[in-house]
Amino acid sequence: MVGSSEAGGEAWRGRYYRLEEVQKHNNSQSTWIIVHHRIYDITKFLDEHPGGEEVLREQAGGDATENFEDVGHSTDARALSETFIIGELHPDDRPKLQKPAETLITTVQSNSSSWSNWVIPAIAAIIVALMYRSYMSE
């Protein structure tokens, strides 16, 4: 269902937008973002955003939930954001926003030579022995 461009109030309740529609609104003439599955038309707010227009435009047409929460917006900022809601992301599109958990993969090079495992300690032992001998001869 296509929603109206009227932002704010409770008029947005029950208005759903498909992800493809939201993704089209990614420019300075029409800037929409998704935060917690709600669609915000922030076009008129770009110039007023305390963090600058660029941070909002980077998120335009996509899910800005993580960035919104990471910044730690004030209660006033959260209340102000409510005035820009125009609808919700269609329930069928919500799984598309789920990001896979990041996995840290550590690899060990199997071609590390075994000579370095004994040569380096052997050289260190020789240096220590020479230093000890030099110290004892004084």
Swiss-Prot record:
Q: Which UniProt keywords apply?
A: Electron transport, Endoplasmic reticulum, Heme, Iron, Membrane, Metal-binding, Microsome, Transmembrane, Transmembrane helix, Transport
- List localization entries: Endoplasmic reticulum membrane; Microsome membrane
Q: The organism sits in which domain of life?
A: Eukaryota
List ligand-binding residues for heme. 49, 73
Which residue ranges traverse the bilayer? 114-136
Q: Please name the GO terms that the record assigns under molecular function.
A: heme binding; metal ion binding
Q: Name one GO cellular component term.
A: intracellular membrane-bounded organelle
**What membrane topology does this protein have?**
Single-pass membrane protein
The cross-references to Gene3D superfamilies, in alphabetical order and at most eight, read:
Cytochrome b5-like heme/steroid binding domain (3.10.120.10)
The principal localisation class reads endoplasmic reticulum
Domain annotation Cytochrome b5 heme-binding: ranges? 14-90
- Role of this protein: Cytochrome b5 is a membrane-bound hemoprotein functioning as an electron carrier for several membrane-bound oxygenases.
* Family, as annotated: Belongs to the cytochrome b5 family.
Q: What is this protein called?
A: Cytochrome b5
Q: Which organism is it from?
A: Gallus gallus
